[in-house]
From Swiss-Prot:
Molecular function per GO: ATP binding; lysine-tRNA ligase activity; magnesium ion binding; tRNA binding
Residues engaged in binding Mg(2+) 1: 416, 423
Residues that, per the record, bind Mg(2+) 2: 423
Keyword Magnesium: yes
Protein's recorded name: Lysine--tRNA ligase
Listed InterPro entries: Aa-tRNA-synt_II (IPR004364), aa-tRNA-synth_II (IPR006195), aa-tRNA-synth_II/BPL/LPL (IPR045864), Lys-tRNA-ligase_II (IPR002313), Lys-tRNA-ligase_II_N (IPR044136), Lys-tRNA-synth_II_C (IPR018149), NA-bd_OB-fold (IPR012340), NA-bd_OB_tRNA (IPR004365)
GO biological process terms on file: lysyl-tRNA aminoacylation
């Protein structure tokens, strides 16, 4: 029967902490309280993989003795013998301890240990009468005393904010959380290996920028004391990576952090991880094919399959991704519009006003038809793009770094990839005309002067780099956190960031 007693109160917790501090004080009196001379030679998962299939007779014949260490998660004292569950970085293994083997003093010491303590065990591997793989302790040591009691098994870490704020406790108590971050590591590793296999060169570019650029976003501002100058945490590495293309590195990528001084939501964290890559002699169509394959490889690396379940719906990444223009997406996913209406700036502006958008303020006050259509897409269709879908043909006015189409006025060779209604990637054929780029920067400065806080600055050094000549290039950025949300069936970006940003504790 499950014990559903009330969760421990703060008073109970304070009493338990005091008792544990008293135990630690006694340990200090008797010798080294936190020894650091034990090295395990086995992990729980490896032991299960090797020996779960053997019976006790085979284990006895093998006579395998191991040294394991980890956190004690369960403890059952039954007179002269006890069982404990040890949790290490790979999983859990049962420990069997008996007074006759350990001796009176060591067994008495074990009985004083608490759930959460870090312990070391050495002994042979065997199976209990019930067939559970275990380690029979010939010796047992306390390596690190836990002063704070863990949440009890039934109540666990129920408070979602507590899970984010005290991720260390969440990782101890919640197997699913550990699996999420293991999958994240595998996904990033799979992406990195795929990039290296494709001939890309991994680089690291500055995190502190004298001029923020590479994205439409509000930066964090800081001050460099030694140089006595204002600096910005980077909002994107794009302009530095393209400088490297100018310098002769034809394929570069970077997996690193970006910082944007904006809101927090299930899809946004001020500090987040992006993978940006740039390839000389590539265009946006090549980028779409490459990105599609890259995301499949990440899914397989993290989960073993390109067919996933996300929030109880199937998500099939194995099939070709859809391609739609902004207007095609509105007509398909937002009911009631016609192409003639979408081609009428006054109509689109009126629709946006009905939907609650501030069309009188920046940036929409100065927006042309393309930017208005994009805003309507974001309000009406974006959230409905469950299937992987490339939205293509973005207007020039919202794409200041993208190459303009040779055949369609006002349109760039740009795409954004949406999956489950979220933007996952943004890429384009890069603008490598320095005079065109300078003109677009000037337009961005005008927008900033008119009140658009996310408009870009004029980066004279980047223009100088382009003036040396940049080959035709394609570049793309993939949001690692949002991608991992998909791969791990996580509803919030905070679920896939180890230490997400939270309000300061009172």
């Amino acid at each position: 029967m499950t014990d559903q007693s009330p969760a421990p109160t703060a008073q109970d917790e304070n009493r338990l902490i005091a008792e544990r501090r008293a135990k630690l004080a006694r340990l200090r009196e008797t010798g080294v309280a936190f020894p650091n001379d034990f090295v395990p030679d086995a992990h729980a998962a490896d032991l299960h993989a090797r020996y779960d299939g053997l019976d006790q007779e085979a284990l006895t014949a093998a006579a395998v003795t191991v040294k394991v260490a980890g956190r004690m998660m369960l403890k059952r004292v039954m007179g002269k013998a006890s069982f404990a569950t040890l949790q290490d970085g790979s999983g859990r293994i049962q420990i069997y301890l008996e007074r006759g083997t350990l001796g009176e003093e060591a067994y008495a010491a074990f009985k004083q240990w608490d759930i959460g303590d870090i312990i070391a065990i050495e002994g042979p591997v065997f199976k209990t009468n019930k067939g559970e793989l275990s380690v029979h302790a010939n010796s047992a040591r306390l390596l690190s005393k836990s002063l704070r009691p863990l949440p009890d098994k039934f109540h666990g870490v129920a408070d979602q904010e507590l899970r984010y704020r005290q991720r260390y406790v969440d990782l101890i108590m919640t197997d699913a959380t550990r699996r999420t971050f293991e999958a994240r590591s595998k996904a990033v590793g799979g992406i990195r290996q795929a990039m290296l296999n494709a001939g890309f060169f991994e680089v690291e570019t500055p995190m502190l920028h004298p001029i923020p650029g590479g994205a439409a976003a509000k930066p964090f501002v800081t001050h460099h004391n030694a140089l006595d100058m204002q600096m910005f945490l980077r909002i994107a590495p794009e302009l530095y990576l393209k400088r490297l293309i100018v310098g002769g590195f034809e394929r570069v990528f970077e997996i690193n952090r970006n910082f944007r001084n904006e809101g927090v939501s299930p899809r946004h964290n001020p500090e987040f991880t992006m993978m940006e890559f740039y390839a000389a002699y590539a265009d946006y169509r090549w980028l779409m094919d490459f990105t599609e394959d890259l995301i499949r490889q990440a899914a397989i690396a993290a989960t073993g399959s390109a067919v996933l379940s996300y929030q109880d719906r199937e998500l099939d990444l194995s099939q070709p991704f859809d391609h739609l223009t902004i207007c095609e997406a509105i007509l398909k996913y937002a009911e009631g519009y016609t192409q003639a209406q979408l081609d009428d700036p006054a109509f689109v502006r009126a629709e946006l006003r009905k939907l609650g958008a501030n069309v009188e303020g920046p940036p929409l006050a100065r927006a042309g038809l393309g930017a208005l259509q994009l805003a309507l897409f974001e309000e009406t269709a974006e959230a409905r793009l469950w299937r992987p879908t490339y939205i293509i043909d973005y207007p020039v006015e919202v794409s200041p770094l993208a190459r303009a189409s040779d055949t369609r006025d006002g349109i760039t060779e740009r795409f954004e990839l949406f999956i489950t209604g979220r933007e996952i990637a943004n890429g384009f054929s890069e603008l490598n005309d320095p005079e065109d780029q300078a003109e677009r920067f000037r337009a961005q400065v005008e927008a900033k002067d008119a009140g658009d806080e996310e408009a870009m600055y004029f980066d004279a050094d980047y223009i100088r780099a382009l003036e040396y000549g940049m080959p035709p290039t394609g570049g793309c950025g993939i949001g690692i956190d949002r991608l991992v949300m998909l791969l791990t069936d996580s509803p919030s970006i905070r679920d896939v960031i180890l230490f997400p940003h939270l309000r300061r504790e009172d």
